[in-house]
Amino acid sequence: AGDLGLLLLRVFTGALLIHHGYEKLANIENFADAFVRPLHLPFPILLSYVAAFSEVIGSWLLITGLLTRMGALAVAGTISVAIYHAIVTAGFNIYLLELLGLYFAAAVAVLACGPGVFSIDELIARRLEPDMQFSAAEDTDFAAGEAAVLEEAVASR
């Protein structure tokens, strides 16, 4: 059930976010003028392209489950700058921050949990390590299992 939840989170987040990146690429000058220059950041056109490609490529990586954590990191980074922009220009306006907060939380959740078993990352991990006793997407479960073994060993003393 958890892996299905991660799949849905990845696919819906990527599918809903990707158009924002394509819209930036369609008119990069307007995006730079409206969002990057007000923050007084250097190289506004370059940073606008970085934001757009982070959203487009990061979204595709989330959707496919390939290099998923890198995609989630790109999305979280770009969205954190968008949150900063929203706060600087409009204060703590919940109507601006709620969608950004959801995108950020989804990216951080995928970053923390990994892609799940329904991902290209998992297929690659299984192909590279055919004798693996546990899923690469379930490394936290493996760590929990190690902790249980240690607790059992201590209790048996």
Q: Each predicted region: which residue ranges?
A:
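Extended, low-polarity transmembrane helix blocks
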Residues: 1-26, 45-53, 57, 64-157
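Membrane-interface interhelical connector segments
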Residues: 25-43
